[in-house]
Amino acid sequence: MPTQRWAPGTQCMTKCENSRPKPGELAFRKGDMVTILEACEDKSWYRAKHHSSGQEGLLAAAALRQREALSTDPKLSLMPWFHGKISGQEAIQQLQPPEDGLFLVRESARHPGDYVLCVSFGRDVIHYRVLHRDGHLTIDEAVCFCNLMDMVEHYTRDKGAICTKLVKPKRKQGAKSAEEELAKAGWLLDLQHLTLGAQIGEGEFGAVLQGEYLGQKVAVKNIKCDVTAQAFLDETAVMTKLQHRNLVRLLGVILHHGLYIVMEHVSKGNLVNFLRTRGRALVSTSQLLQFALHVAEGMEYLESKKLVHRDLAARNILVSEDLVAKVSDFGLAKAELRKGLDSSRLPVKWTAPEALKNGRFSSKSDVWSFGVLLWEVFSYGRAPYPKMSLKEVSEAVEKGYRMEPPDSCPGPVHTLMGSCWEAEPSRRPPFRKIVEKLGRELRSVGVAAPAGGQEAEGSAPTRSQDP
């Protein structure tokens, strides 16, 4: 039976133990995390880097397994010790029997908007009011924190102004600890192996930084707000189930000062800037078609998983060193047909009329956005609906206005844009059909369409190196 192949950069868990490695082999215990560096030519061996020790060495493919997708039911909680609106007396009851360092956090009944840290010490439960000061949280006004997670992490290490270090969280009934589940499934990364570098982007919910994790280039999104971090954790749990060459790959999560989401680094940046800085002289029509096809294949995969992106635009497409376009930024991604997103935050020029008007998102609204992305691509990164305000765009589109094709845009591509912009969502093509049409157009200009689909972990380059 053939052993699964693992591509360089893949993070795996070990299925067994190798406590007495031979020279050149890697020592590991069952359940350790390793990153594949390269494949050997014979016997399905790999050179890998151990996450905890930082050592490199050889290990057999048979000793590896893929990380598990995270379960989203029940929902994972970044703050399983947060009990919401309970009284001080209820907190005391929760922290029985007494145990030094047993703790929970609750909302303050006397001071709405503030929190209370409740800590068991001796035979008592001490209640510390958590104050808001200049956008931060504090107990003693000497040490301030970005959020509750930051505060709990600090007092777990250092008792400071409170009676004792926080030792054991009292978990709210039904809460599932994100930290425990991430670690068990292999998605919890170690902060000590992360080096942060320059900022490479700025999203609505936080900065995106370049970094290195165990020597591998990564992109890191840091979300500090408790509520936003929890929302992003929910989306991250969905991302652990996704694997496709045209989706930016999740590497893992670090819980420190909020939430660090660690993604693969895609070296050539977003598609808008790529096209604007190169233009027609350097980017051929066939290359534009390939980019469009890559995006459509990634979206076809999301469609098959009944997931809706909701913010599909060229700015959210990243280009790799080998010119593969990858769909990124799943911050708004949700299960199909969800409602209720604040309309003031919607990217109006890319959003389908039914989503703007009724908050109704589906794969068909993503298809509308893909039509706008096509226009961006074949205009070499121009902003859509030039010289029109957002209000003018929404009103004109509602009345049937559609953009003219960019200069030199192939006729079939313009026809495809038009079908993506059908007013009736059911008349828009599924991404499967879009992939077929773009593939045909690419072949018509003499370029073979690349084989798409779910990423095979076995596309690893090999070298002759055998233990």
From Swiss-Prot:
Q: Which organism is it from?
A: Rattus norvegicus (Rat)
Q: What's the protein here called?
A: Megakaryocyte-associated tyrosine-protein kinase
Q: Locate the SH3 domain: which residues?
A: 7-69
Catalytic activity entry: L-tyrosyl-[protein] + ATP = O-phospho-L-tyrosyl-[protein] + ADP + H(+)
Member of which family? Belongs to the protein kinase superfamily. Tyr protein kinase family. CSK subfamily.
The UniProt entry lists the main location of this chain as cytoplasm
| Domain Protein kinase span(s) in chain numbering | 194-443
Q: Name one GO cellular component term.
A: plasma membrane
Disordered as annotated region, ranges: 1-20, 445-467
PANTHER family from the xrefs? TYROSINE-PROTEIN KINASE
Where found?
A: Cytoplasm; Membrane
Quaternary structure annotation from Swiss-Prot or TrEMBL: Interacts with KIT.
Q: Which Gene3D superfamilies match?
A: SH2 domain, SH3 Domains, Transferase(Phosphotransferase) domain 1
Output the superkingdom of the source species: Eukaryota
**PROSITE patterns documented for this protein:** PROTEIN_KINASE_ATP (PS00107), PROTEIN_KINASE_DOM (PS50011), PROTEIN_KINASE_TYR (PS00109), SH2 (PS50001), SH3 (PS50002)
